[in-house]
Amino acid sequence: MTLRHLCFGIFAALVLSACKVQVTVPTSGSVTTVSGAIDCAAGQVCDVDVTDIYFDETFVAQPAPGFEFIGWKETHRGFCGGNTTPCRLNTAGFEGNETLTAILEDPQQEFYLEPAFRSTGFKSLFMGHSFFRPFAEAMPFHAAQAGIPNHEQTVVFAGGSNGAPEALWDNTEKRVQIQAVLDAGDIDLFVMTYHPDYPGLRGYRLWLDYALAQNPDTRFVVALPWAFQPGQTPTAQYASDWHTGHASVIHPGIDILRGQYPGTDIFCIPYGHAAIRLRELFDAGQLDDVDFLASGSGDAIFSDTFGHADDILVDLGSLVWLQALYGVDLDSYAWDPGYNTDLKAIAAEIMQAHDADFDAPYH
């Protein structure tokens, strides 16, 4: 054995002697051990006590139907990060090691184990307005490009405030159209948007009630766009208003819905942040891919003064959707948007900045 391997072995032995291993499981699978002694169900956080030097368990990630295990997450003080095989944690054979014993006796020692699961493709229903539709329509391309084989979708559109969940429910023709899709009982993912003319939760509740009655395993998403007429508000104020609404309206609303629908996945896509970041870069002279804030010629962030998305905003926002819905690692995503600006890096930064409590809990 080389010195390098010996040092690594000693370090691993010490780390494995922690008093507690916290196993965090997404809602898309479970973690068990080969011995059957430990069973951590979907959505649970399980604390495993390691109290002696004879602990020997092999942890196995079990994906739920429609998901695949893509490896153990790489986290601070995490075990087996980056590996895709069962994770064996073993303290056996170190009797008499004083350093090891001291770690075992230290109640502050805690280490982590967390699997990553990825959907093989959701059967999805997307409904919303014109600030929402282009991103929904981009998903089949991006899902296929990312190697997600079973993505299917239906998109229902209504312009302006008519695309808000409550307005779509109150529109008999649209409601019947959407209910017909839900009635099949096989919608895995139901994505809705937001419009300030309907700030309350009534529409979301009505759709959740109906969808869950057809399929109790449906997951729900609130996709938050940017504000309209961006040119009428200074950039700093425009950004501040969006972030304030995101944190004080959308996230609290999701928390309320989670309390009313326990056990149901409800989360947020902050794709409106894409418009904010592009505008900030444009104002700073750091966005040479466009010439105007708003223009109908395809060389702007917005295609008109009302604020509809031009190509670069659609491409950036679609990357945010892709990571939010499917957990795709954008650093390795094999697609070149074709801009000088690194849109994949910006999209990853947007998702990194998003409050993780409101990300998809199944990743």
Q: What does each model-found stretch correspond to?
A:
Residues Q179-D311, Q323, S332:
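Alpha-helical cap/lid subdomain in secreted, periplasmic
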Residues S124-M127, F131-Y210:
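Conserved SGNH/GDSL esterase-like catalytic core that processes O-acyl groups on lipids
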Residues Y54-E95:
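Surface-exposed interfaces of beta-sheet-rich extracellular modules
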Residues F292-H363:
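Conserved catalytic region of serine esterases and O-acyltransferases that act on ester linkages
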Residues G36-G66, P107:
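Extracellular modular ligand-binding repeats in secreted and cell-surface proteins
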Residues S119-Q145, W335-G338, A347-H363:
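N-terminal module-boundary/linker segments of secreted carbohydrate-active enzymes
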Residues V23, V31-T33, F59, F69-W72, ...:
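Extracellular/surface recognition and adhesion modules
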